[in-house]
Amino acid sequence: MPANKKHSRRIDRTKAFQVLYSLHFTQINTIETLKEIFLNLPNPLEERNTGIITELDTQISFSWQLVEGVWRNVTRLDKIISQFSQNWRVDRLGKIELTLLRIATFEMYYCPDVPPKVSLNEALELATCFGDEKARKFINGILDAIIKAIETEKINYIDKN
């Protein structure tokens, strides 16, 4: 993957994290409200370089795919996460950790073009930015277990339909 695309995807994940994290503090019942929150959140790339229109368009689409996908599949994602978070109920996880786990798990199951190890590494990078070392280790353990289950075909990609 070219460095520019990798950088853009990290920004996408950052925006998705910010939107999805904010949902812990507000009730969203419609896709329209979710879109409004998404579009009103400042774009990290705009703050750095307002002249890159094509990258902004790309970022919006991948960021939105993550936000909408996690929002629509949160129950499924939480069920998967709970299978691998030994002795931890999903409702007891920290909001940062849970949000990062949901994004990475969504990518692992619904984005076959993204290698699971990339999803794990990106979640760890975001955990470094938004969490602490303890959170990073916790996220690594759960996502690593999910990857091993995918690799041994104990669990499969989820049909999007």
Curated annotation (Swiss-Prot):
Give a GO molecular function annotation for the protein. RNA binding
Keyword Ribosomal protein recorded: no
Keyword Transcription regulation annotated: yes
Which InterPro entries does the annotation name?
Answer: NusB-like_sf, NusB_fam, NusB_RsmB_TIM44
Instruction: Cite the SUPFAM superfamilies for this sequence.
Output: NusB-like
Q: Which UniProt keywords apply?
A: RNA-binding, Transcription, Transcription antitermination, Transcription regulation
Please give the biological process terms from Gene Ontology that the record holds: DNA-templated transcription termination; transcription antitermination
The record's Gene Ontology cellular component field reads: cytosol
Which Pfam family would be a valid example here? NusB
Query: What domain of life does the native source organism fall in?
Result: Bacteria
Q: Which family does it belong to?
A: Belongs to the NusB family.
Function description: Involved in transcription antitermination. Required for transcription of ribosomal RNA (rRNA) genes. Binds specifically to the boxA antiterminator sequence of the ribosomal RNA (rrn) operons.
* Name of the molecule in the record: Transcription antitermination protein NusB
* Upper classification of the organism: Bacteria, Pseudomonadati, Thermodesulfobacteriota, Desulfovibrionia, Desulfovibrionales
